[in-house]
Protein backbone atom coordinates (compact mmCIF):
# COMPACT_ATOMS: atom_id res chain seq x y z
CA UNK A 1 0.00 0.00 0.00
CA UNK A 2 2.88 2.39 0.61
CA UNK A 3 3.82 2.04 -3.09
CA UNK A 4 0.36 3.28 -4.00
CA UNK A 5 0.78 6.35 -1.81
CA UNK A 6 4.26 7.11 -3.17
CA UNK A 7 3.26 6.72 -6.81
CA UNK A 8 -0.11 8.46 -6.38
CA UNK A 9 -2.91 5.95 -6.91
CA UNK A 10 -5.12 8.81 -8.10
CA UNK A 11 -2.98 9.00 -11.28
CA UNK A 12 -4.21 5.56 -12.40
CA UNK A 13 -7.39 6.03 -14.49
CA UNK A 14 -8.51 2.42 -13.98
CA UNK A 15 -9.09 3.11 -10.28
CA UNK A 16 -11.88 5.51 -11.21
CA UNK A 17 -13.78 3.16 -13.52
CA UNK A 18 -16.76 1.33 -12.04
CA UNK A 19 -16.89 3.00 -8.63
CA UNK A 20 -18.52 1.16 -5.76
CA UNK A 21 -21.87 2.82 -5.03
CA UNK A 22 -24.25 1.91 -2.21
CA UNK A 23 -26.74 3.51 0.18
CA UNK A 24 -26.23 3.80 3.93
CA UNK A 25 -28.42 4.76 6.88
CA UNK A 26 -27.63 8.14 8.45
CA UNK A 27 -26.80 6.75 11.89
CA UNK A 28 -24.31 4.26 10.42
CA UNK A 29 -22.77 7.06 8.34
CA UNK A 30 -22.28 9.22 11.45
CA UNK A 31 -20.78 6.27 13.33
CA UNK A 32 -18.28 5.41 10.57
CA UNK A 33 -17.36 8.83 9.21
CA UNK A 34 -17.93 10.81 12.42
CA UNK A 35 -20.10 13.84 13.09
CA UNK A 36 -19.64 16.39 10.30
CA UNK A 37 -17.46 13.80 8.49
CA UNK A 38 -14.69 14.22 11.06
CA UNK A 39 -13.00 10.92 10.09
CA UNK A 40 -13.74 10.95 6.34
CA UNK A 41 -10.38 12.38 5.23
CA UNK A 42 -8.45 10.01 7.52
CA UNK A 43 -10.37 7.01 6.15
CA UNK A 44 -9.63 8.11 2.58
CA UNK A 45 -5.92 8.66 3.20
CA UNK A 46 -5.45 5.45 5.19
CA UNK A 47 -7.36 3.30 2.68
CA UNK A 48 -6.07 4.93 -0.55
CA UNK A 49 -9.63 5.63 -1.66
CA UNK A 50 -11.78 8.63 -2.44
CA UNK A 51 -15.17 8.49 -0.71
CA UNK A 52 -18.05 10.76 -1.71
CA UNK A 53 -21.08 11.09 0.57
CA UNK A 54 -24.39 12.39 -0.82
CA UNK A 55 -26.76 12.91 2.08
CA UNK A 56 -30.50 12.43 1.79
CA UNK A 57 -30.00 10.90 -1.66
CA UNK A 58 -32.95 8.51 -1.34
CA UNK A 59 -36.54 9.34 -0.32
CA UNK A 60 -35.96 7.46 2.95
CA UNK A 61 -33.09 9.78 3.86
CA UNK A 62 -30.24 7.40 3.21
CA UNK A 63 -26.81 8.60 2.15
CA UNK A 64 -25.41 7.53 -1.21
CA UNK A 65 -21.76 6.46 -0.76
CA UNK A 66 -19.38 6.32 -3.75
CA UNK A 67 -15.92 4.77 -3.34
CA UNK A 68 -13.14 4.89 -5.96
CA UNK A 69 -9.58 3.64 -5.72
CA UNK A 70 -7.74 0.32 -5.99
CA UNK A 71 -10.16 -2.64 -6.08
CA UNK A 72 -8.78 -4.37 -2.98
CA UNK A 73 -9.04 -1.14 -0.99
CA UNK A 74 -12.62 -0.55 -2.18
CA UNK A 75 -13.58 -4.08 -1.19
CA UNK A 76 -11.92 -3.64 2.21
CA UNK A 77 -13.84 -0.40 2.87
CA UNK A 78 -17.12 -2.00 1.79
CA UNK A 79 -16.46 -5.08 3.95
CA UNK A 80 -15.72 -2.86 6.96
CA UNK A 81 -18.95 -0.90 6.44
CA UNK A 82 -20.96 -4.11 5.95
CA UNK A 83 -19.57 -5.63 9.14
CA UNK A 84 -20.15 -2.49 11.23
CA UNK A 85 -23.82 -2.58 10.23
CA UNK A 86 -24.25 -6.34 10.57
CA UNK A 87 -26.81 -7.89 12.90
CA UNK A 88 -24.26 -10.61 13.70
CA UNK A 89 -22.37 -9.66 16.88
CA UNK A 90 -19.10 -11.25 15.76
CA UNK A 91 -19.19 -9.38 12.43
CA UNK A 92 -20.02 -6.13 14.27
CA UNK A 93 -17.00 -6.58 16.51
CA UNK A 94 -14.76 -7.32 13.51
CA UNK A 95 -16.16 -4.26 11.71
CA UNK A 96 -15.58 -2.00 14.69
CA UNK A 97 -12.01 -3.27 15.00
CA UNK A 98 -11.48 -2.61 11.28
CA UNK A 99 -12.90 0.90 11.76
CA UNK A 100 -10.57 1.63 14.68
CA UNK A 101 -7.64 0.27 12.66
CA UNK A 102 -8.33 2.46 9.61
CA UNK A 103 -8.76 5.54 11.79
CA UNK A 104 -5.43 4.83 13.49
CA UNK A 105 -3.06 3.81 10.68
CA UNK A 106 -2.92 3.14 6.92
CA UNK A 107 -3.87 -0.24 5.51
CA UNK A 108 -1.01 -2.65 4.91
CA UNK A 109 -0.80 -5.23 2.15
CA UNK A 110 -1.68 -8.00 4.60
CA UNK A 111 -4.85 -6.10 5.58
CA UNK A 112 -5.97 -6.30 1.96
CA UNK A 113 -5.59 -10.05 1.64
CA UNK A 114 -8.99 -11.54 0.94
CA UNK A 115 -10.17 -14.23 3.31
CA UNK A 116 -13.11 -16.40 2.26
CA UNK A 117 -16.14 -16.23 4.49
CA UNK A 118 -18.53 -19.12 4.28
CA UNK A 119 -22.16 -18.33 3.64
CA UNK A 120 -21.53 -14.83 2.38
CA UNK A 121 -22.71 -13.11 -0.80
CA UNK A 122 -22.42 -9.77 -2.52
CA UNK A 123 -24.31 -8.69 -5.61
CA UNK A 124 -22.90 -6.03 -7.92
CA UNK A 125 -24.61 -4.85 -11.09
CA UNK A 126 -23.43 -2.25 -13.56
CA UNK A 127 -25.47 0.52 -15.14
CA UNK A 128 -24.08 3.59 -16.89
CA UNK A 129 -20.46 2.81 -15.92
CA UNK A 130 -21.34 2.92 -12.22
CA UNK A 131 -21.25 -0.16 -10.01
CA UNK A 132 -24.24 -0.47 -7.71
CA UNK A 133 -23.93 -2.74 -4.72
CA UNK A 134 -26.79 -4.43 -2.94
CA UNK A 135 -25.91 -6.58 0.03
CA UNK A 136 -28.98 -8.31 1.45
CA UNK A 137 -28.62 -8.83 5.19
CA UNK A 138 -28.87 -12.61 4.83
CA UNK A 139 -26.22 -12.84 2.10
CA UNK A 140 -22.49 -12.16 2.28
CA UNK A 141 -19.77 -13.29 -0.19
CA UNK A 142 -19.50 -15.38 -3.13
CA UNK A 143 -19.03 -12.56 -5.50
CA UNK A 144 -20.73 -11.93 -8.82
CA UNK A 145 -19.36 -8.97 -10.75
CA UNK A 146 -20.46 -7.57 -14.10
CA UNK A 147 -18.46 -4.73 -15.68
CA UNK A 148 -19.22 -2.90 -18.91
CA UNK A 149 -16.12 -2.34 -21.05
CA UNK A 150 -16.50 -0.32 -24.25
CA UNK A 151 -19.99 -1.65 -24.92
CA UNK A 152 -19.17 -5.24 -23.97
CA UNK A 153 -20.42 -6.84 -20.80
CA UNK A 154 -17.94 -9.02 -18.96
CA UNK A 155 -19.37 -11.10 -16.15
CA UNK A 156 -17.07 -12.55 -13.55
CA UNK A 157 -18.66 -15.06 -11.19
CA UNK A 158 -16.69 -15.97 -8.13
CA UNK A 159 -18.08 -18.54 -5.76
CA UNK A 160 -15.50 -17.97 -3.07
CA UNK A 161 -12.87 -15.31 -2.40
CA UNK A 162 -10.28 -18.08 -2.63
CA UNK A 163 -11.17 -18.27 -6.35
CA UNK A 164 -10.22 -14.62 -6.83
CA UNK A 165 -6.74 -14.27 -8.30
CA UNK A 166 -4.98 -10.89 -8.03
From Swiss-Prot:
GO cellular component assignments: cytoplasm
CDD domains xrefs: FILIA_N_like
Domain of life: Eukaryota
InterPro entries: KH_dom_type_1_sf, MOEP19_KH-like
Presence of keyword rRNA-binding: no
Localization (cell): Cytoplasm
Any one of the GO BP annotations: apoptotic process
This protein's UniProt keywords: Apoptosis, Cytoplasm, RNA-binding
Pfam families: MOEP19 (PF16005)
Induction: By NR4A1/NUR77.
KH domain segment(s): 19-78
A Gene Ontology molecular function term of the record: identical protein binding
Family of the protein in this entry: Belongs to the KHDC1 family.
Cited PANTHER family: DEVELOPMENT PLURPOTENCY-ASSOCIATED PROTEIN 1/5 FAMILY MEMBER, KH HOMOLOGY DOMAIN-CONTAINING PROTEIN 1
Summary of the function given for this chain in its UniProt record: Has pro-apoptotic activity.
Name of the protein in its database record: KH homology domain-containing protein 1A
Originating species: Mus musculus (Mouse)
